[in-house]
Amino acid sequence: MLMPRRVKYRKQQRGRMKGKAKGGTFVQFGEWGLKALEPAWITAQQIEACRIAMLRVMKRSGKIWIRIFPDKPYTKKPPESRMGKGKGNVEGWVAVVKPGKILFEVAGVDEETAHEALRYAASKLPIATKIVPRHHIGGEAV
């Protein structure tokens, strides 16, 4: 699973997911990308499930870029515990995703395989997504 090696503070506040993504909104490395259309927390387990699903479709050919990283800890209190008595223990790690963010990129496979791989990855995620191509302006990739 993806998670930070070390963090300055063990626990974080939840925060808010207002507005659109500031960076990482264009396909930069691959030929096709999977773009988020809704805000959400994507867990490390969901990212790993997407990665495995894409590898299975692509039959280990081509290349995959994961453009998000789960750097936010989320906590949970034990079952049947009363309220109060401090914040719960860290349960896992999540990536905060805003609309417009590119989640995954694919290259080195034909268009049909890339679409199928990204469609399989999208089925593993709890948000609406769309498949976007890399933009070429004047014969040069942007």
From Swiss-Prot:
CDD domains for the chain: Ribosomal_L16_L10e (cd01433)
UniProt entry keywords in alphabetical sequence: Ribonucleoprotein, Ribosomal protein, RNA-binding, rRNA-binding, tRNA-binding
Domain of life: Bacteria
UniProt xrefs under Gene3D superfamilies: Ribosomal protein L10e/L16
NCBIfam families reported in the protein's UniProt record: rplP_bact
Role, per record: Binds 23S rRNA and is also seen to make contacts with the A and possibly P site tRNAs.
Annotated protein name in UniProt: Large ribosomal subunit protein uL16
Organism per entry: Thermotoga maritima (strain ATCC 43589 / DSM 3109 / JCM 10099 / NBRC 100826 / MSB8)
